């Protein structure tokens, strides 16, 4: 579709689509599987995940885990899922009913992804989908990720971190204060900024 709109001679100059760097060869999804996400934002999450896959027509490997670091496919624990159209469909199909335990904090999943797949010379993007952060310390998370996701000799982080925030509580309970949502946004803005990624805050949870 992009080629049709921009013409067959169009070539991206900086590997950006919609402001998101798409130069990675591997992608990891870290998905909040808490009750609030699964009950109210799941269809929208599936749509966002599919849209993300679409901007990477072919990569060398994919991985899916929840915010606790639980792998969707345990047999691929610590390994890349080969990227084929069939496997992409299986990922989407399995996600529809994937309601595993979650503490509604992306920290464990991000750390597990970096520890398992951080490898020099391997371009990886982590996509975090969530709606709140129930952890204790934002600064501790940032310091830990800084330590795990080290820079190369050009000062670039080896793994990009992107994030999409789903406004579940703002929409379901608009009259209440929701500090964990604000903390999630603050955490992910800082992590994406420091790790070469993009933060997207949605304004709706409808698909």
Question: Model regions: which residues?
Answer:
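Pro/Ala/Gly-rich low-complexity, hydrophilic intrinsically disordered segments
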Residues: 1-25
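Von Willebrand factor
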Residues: 20-79, 82-123, 125-129, 135-136, 165-171
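Extracytoplasmic/secreted envelope proteins and their assembly/folding machinery
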Residues: 24, 42, 46-50, 88, ...
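Short beta-strand-loop
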Residues: 61-94, 115-119, 139-142, 173-188
């Amino acid at each position: 579709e992009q080629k049709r709109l921009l013409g067959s001679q169009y070539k991206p100059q900086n590997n950006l689509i919609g402001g998101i760097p798409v130069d990675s060869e591997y992608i990891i999804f870290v998905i909040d599987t808490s009750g609030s996400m699964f009950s109210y934002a799941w269809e929208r999450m599936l749509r966002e995940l599919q849209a993300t896959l679409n901007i990477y027509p072919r990569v060398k490997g994919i991985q899916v885990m929840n915010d606790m670091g639980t792998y969707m496919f345990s047999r691929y624990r610590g390994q890349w899922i080969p990227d084929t159209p069939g496997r992409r469909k299986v990922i989407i199909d399995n996600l529809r009913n994937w309601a595993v335990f979650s503490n509604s904090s992306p920290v464990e999943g991000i750390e597990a992804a970096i520890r398992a797949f951080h490898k020099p010379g391997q371009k990886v993007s982590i996509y975090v989908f969530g709606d709140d952060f129930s952890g204790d310390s934002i600064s501790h998370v940032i310091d830990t990720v800084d330590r795990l996701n080290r820079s190369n000799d050009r000062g670039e982080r080896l793994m990009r971190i992107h994030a999409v925030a789903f406004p579940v509580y703002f929409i379901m309970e608009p009259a209440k204060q929701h500090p964990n949502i604000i903390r999630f946004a603050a955490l992910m803005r800082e992590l994406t900024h420091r790790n070469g990624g993009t933060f997207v805050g949605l304004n709706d949870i409808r698909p």
